[in-house]
Amino acid sequence: ALNRQGGFSAAETMDHLGILAGSIEDMWIMARYISETAGGDPGHPGLYGSRTPPPAKKPERLIVLETAGWNETDDASKAAFNDAIGKLSDAGCEIYTRKDDPAIEAYEAETAHSPELWRQLYRFEMRWPMYQYLDYDADKIPPRLKAGIQEGAGLTQAEYRAALARRVYWREMHDALARRCDAMVPLSSPGPGPVGIDQGSAIYNEASSIIGMPAISLPVMTVEDMPLGMQIKGRVHGDEALTAAGRWVSQELLQ
C-alpha cells in the first residue's frame, strides 16, 4: 500500500513500509500522505481512503486469534490480553474464537505454521545481495542475519514455489474469514519488550507479512510496567475500516 522505492527490501514480496506514530490518527494521516504522493509499490493501487482519519466505529464482531505465538507467550501477557478482550465483550462486541467456529479453528491450525512459511519465503527472496555481503565481510553481519542467509542457501526453487502456492491458499482463507468480522485480534508480541538491544520475537507479525493484510498494533495493555500491544487485522485494502475500528478499540481500552 505504501511505496518502498528508495529504500532496500531484503525480501521483495514480504517487506512493507510501516508507520510508527504517537496516535492512530497520526498514523493514518502519514500513511495517506505517503500513498497519495508516492503511491503504492509499482503495480499496486496504494492505500484507499480519505485524507482525514476515519471516525471511530465500534466493531460489532471480533475474531480473537492465538496464532503461532500463543505457546511462546508468558502468562502475565496472556492474562492482560484476555482481560482486554473481556472489556471489549462487556462493551458489546461479539467475540468469537477457535472454539466457536470450525472455520476459525482451520485458520488457526494453518497459520500456526507461519514461522516455517515465513522462513521459506523470506530466506529464499533475501539471498541476493545477501550472499554477496556474506562473501565480502561476514564478520560485519549480525549472527541472526547470518544464520538466516545460511538457511536460505539450503532452500530449493521447488520449495519456494510450494511456499508461494501455500501463500495463495492462506490469502484465500484469510479473505473468506475476514468477511465475517470487523477485525481479527491477536497479540502484537509474546510479551513486553526485552531488556537490552534484542528486538524480540516477531512471531505474531509473520502471518500479516505473508498474507499482506493490514495490521495495526495498539499499545493498550501493560505488563511489568511496560506497554504490550494488541493487534487488529482486517481485509486486504480494508485499511480505512480497520483504522476506524482501531480508534474505537483504543478509546475503549484506554479510557
Residue ranges and their predicted role:
Residues 108-129:
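Charged, often glycine-rich, active-site loop that binds/positions anionic groups
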Residues 144, 155-255:
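Glycine-rich, small-residue loops and helix-cap segments
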Residues 76-99, 131-136, 160-181:
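Acyltransferase
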Residues 142-150:
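Structural motif of enzymes handling amino- and sulfur-group chemistry
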